[in-house]
Amino acid sequence: MEESQSELGVEPPLSQETFSDLWKLLPENNLLSSELSLAAVNDLLLSPVTNWLDENPDDASRVPAPPAATAPAPAAPAPATSWPLSSFVPSQKTYPGSYDFRLGFLHSGTAKSVTCTYSPALNKLFCQLAKTCPVQLWVSSPPPPGTRVRAMAIYKKSEYMTEVVRRCPHHERSSDYSDGLAPPQHLIRVEGNLRAEYLDDRNTFRHSVVVPYEPPEVGSDCTTIHYNFMCNSSCMGGMNRRPILTIITLEDASGNLLGRNSFEVRVCACPGRDRRTEEENFLKKGQSCPEPPPGSTKRALPTSTSSSPVQKKKPLDGEYFTLQIRGRERFEMFRELNDALELKDAQTARESGENRAHSSHLKSKKGQSPSRHKKPMFKREGPDSD
């Protein structure tokens, strides 16, 4: 068989050759050649890095270290917003001035349906949020041209007077009552007056609204300004149930004071109910009523027989008073009235004394004689009694 293949000149297949024959078939520049040593490989790969470090030794220290796999730190809470305190506390004392400046309010009851009501006994205005509150301005003579009316709110209690009265964060961000004219943090607004200016004092940080003074219309004796209070008295982050005062000042064009007046304000959901409750508590405590300024047009409290408690009659005291009366005829009238009252008191005292003596006499007589209706009881002794 072998002789026949050699004779025909056919070469055996590659799989039948030896390994040494296959090794010799590889090219001479093979990468797997034994002539390529490990040192040559290191020089080929590491020489660029070595040259860069030799040329820039300072940059090697600035090579950033790989970031460490640490847990993310919790976010720090946002700092609480602290509003600046005001170093200026405006006066709240009533000052009529040379123009006899005073305030007036419309008469309104204590029904649940009212949205704004004023209590003369408390000198306090009760109103709902963003509802119309008419305030009347009275003067004895027209002020000079350029006179302005300023409204500013301050806290009533002394421990909060340095804080600026502003709306709560909820109502500041709310767009329900935004008119685009007043800043969102202002509490007091003027309704229906495009000439109103809302001012933020850079020194005192206080908010105020200023409108030009307009003389009364024909047939009217006073000027009326409609104010709105844009936050409830119970709002957290705002007034927070702290009572406030609204100061109304009359100023000339240069800012000089011409008159001042003030009143307390409570912004609530039911003004009529709150006014009735506070007036009843006020009468129970027996506190002295704050006197309105002289010549004020503030309405008097309507007499109510249901809410006011019945006052007990006090006993007569022994004090004497002197009353100066002008005119002889009026003096005789009061003298006769006084004599009649003295006679009545004497008769009352005499009758009470006689009744007291008669009642004591009857009691003593009853104690001495037995009653005629009662029969005397005797003890009978029988034959069986021992």
Swiss-Prot record:
Chief location bin = cytoplasm
Q: Where is this region: Interaction with AXIN1?
A: 108-285
Site-annotated residues for Interaction with DNA: K112
Q: Where is this region: Transcription activation (acidic)?
A: 1-45
User: N6-acetyllysine occurs at which residues?
Assistant: K112, K298, K314, K366, K374, K375
Cofactor(s) required, per the database record: Zn(2+)
> Origin, by domain of life?
Eukaryota
One Gene Ontology MF term: promoter-specific chromatin binding
- State its location(s): Cytoplasm; Nucleus; Nucleus, PML body; Endoplasmic reticulum
Kindly state which keywords UniProt assigns to this record, in alphabetical order.
Acetylation, Activator, Apoptosis, Biological rhythms, Cell cycle, Cytoplasm, Cytoskeleton, DNA-binding, Endoplasmic reticulum, Isopeptide bond, Metal-binding, Methylation, Mitochondrion, Necrosis, Nucleus, Phosphoprotein, Repressor, Transcription, Transcription regulation, Tumor suppressor, Ubl conjugation, Zinc
Region Interaction with HIPK1, as annotated, extends over 92-363
Residues in the DNA-binding region are 94-285
Q: Which disorder is it associated with?
A: p53 is found in increased amounts in a wide variety of transformed cells. p53 is frequently mutated or inactivated in many types of cancer.
Indicate what this protein is called per its UniProt record: Cellular tumor antigen p53
Q: What is the lineage of its organism?
A: Eukaryota, Metazoa, Chordata, Craniata, Vertebrata
